[in-house]
Amino acid sequence: MSAAADRLNLTSGHLNAGRKRSSSSVSLKAAEKPFKVTVIGSGNWGTTIAKVVAENCKGYPEVFAPIVQMWVFEEEINGEKLTEIINTRHQNVKYLPGITLPDNLVANPDLIDSVKDVDIIVFNIPHQFLPRICSQLKGHVDSHVRAISCLKGFEVGAKGVQLLSSYITEELGIQCGALSGANIATEVAQEHWSETTVAYHIPKDFRGEGKDVDHKVLKALFHRPYFHVSVIEDVAGISICGALKNVVALGCGFVEGLGWGNNASAAIQRVGLGEIIRFGQMFFPESREETYYQESAGVADLITTCAGGRNVKVARLMATSGKDAWECEKELLNGQSAQGLITCKEVHEWLETCGSVEDFPLFEAVYQIVYNNYPMKNLPDMIEELDLHED
């Protein structure tokens, strides 16, 4: 064997060391009582995930109840209720137009009714609405219920910075994991192949296979031929990357709008990845560094998001038009959110409280540009401050 082949095998061994992935096939024990699933949220990504879940609930009748409820914040589209459009035409014409939804996916405008007798809740709403949703759900969700958060962001309050999955667990008393990955919603909805990561820690009160949600059940719930799922336990790792990638993407949008090209975008992503990992090490030491490199929820998601997601588009328009972030968001996103705008403020507030702002110059630069109109052209100097501090 050549020296080059030896090096390749050695590198492969390092990359895969300690990596535990579930296989693409799912071997399941029939549930004693099929799990009833509800998706809370009906935006672009919420509807896409609801489509995936409904397809799998129909495909595994021995494991899941066939009907999937999707809570919809009711709107009127040309005089028709959005829920009625979804339930009769099987399309979300506002947030996911052109995509046919499964007939077992039922839009429900009543939040409390949508979670009646539920076993699994998938949260997929803009994260700023989570406290209000949890407040409404309190007292209506049994402790046996399990949840997955597809939200991107943090909850920052008197208790410090919290993962949104932890916030859900604390507020509702239910075990909650997370789903995150290199997933542009429209591409997933169009059934173009992609990967994602689901993270879930089996709780101490696990009731047993066939009676409770485990990694096999979650694999069956989310895995599709076009949507490949890796199930791991590092909820913190995938949640951190899922939140902070949007802040990095704003930085990429700024330099793109300034016309600085691919080299500048790559520099932002390099610095951003370092700050994401540093944030995890400092504030969530239970997160695993390999998650950032090896999972779809890590560097792959960062690359995809920085290639042209909502945050890049908003930041690019800010740079080219001189408009503020909120004008650009309203103009571009059809009522949806660029989550990085909120996350960068939450991160700034937390870092300021901890006295750690100087350790995260890119995150701070993005915050100052969005909220205090710092000149975008100063980004390189602001980022280089980290090296000065380390010297």
From Swiss-Prot:
Chief location: cytoplasm
Entry annotation: catalytic residues: 245 (proton acceptor)
Effect of residue 225 to S: In strain: WFB
EC number: 1.1.1.8
Protein name: Glycerol-3-phosphate dehydrogenase [NAD(+)] 1
UniProt similarity note: Belongs to the NAD-dependent glycerol-3-phosphate dehydrogenase family.
Species in which this protein is naturally found: Saccharomyces cerevisiae (strain ATCC 204508 / S288c)
Keyword Disulfide bond applies: no
Reactions that this protein is recorded to catalyse: sn-glycerol 3-phosphate + NAD(+) = dihydroxyacetone phosphate + NADH + H(+)
Note: Present with 807 molecules/cell in log phase SD medium.
Keyword Signal: no
Regulation: induction: By osmotic stress and by methylglyoxal in a HOG pathway-dependent manner.
Molecular functions per Gene Ontology: glycerol-3-phosphate dehydrogenase (NAD+) activity; glycerol-3-phosphate dehydrogenase [NAD(P)+] activity; NAD binding; protein homodimerization activity
Keyword terms, alphabetized: Acetylation, Cytoplasm, NAD, Oxidoreductase, Peroxisome, Phosphoprotein, Stress response
Residue numbers carrying Phosphoserine: 24, 27
Biological function: Catalyzes the production and accumulation of glycerol during hyperosmotic stress conditions. Glycerol acts as an osmoregulator that prevents loss of water and turgor of the cells.
InterPro entries in the cross-refs: 6-PGluconate_DH-like_C_sf, 6PGD_dom2, G3P_DH_NAD-dep, G3P_DH_NAD-dep_C, G3P_DH_NAD-dep_euk, G3P_DH_NAD-dep_N, NAD(P)-bd_dom_sf
Any one GO cellular component localisation term in the record: peroxisome
NCBIfam families listed in its UniProt record: glycerol3P_DH (TIGR03376)
Pfam family, one: NAD_Gly3P_dh_N
BP term (GO), one: intracellular accumulation of glycerol
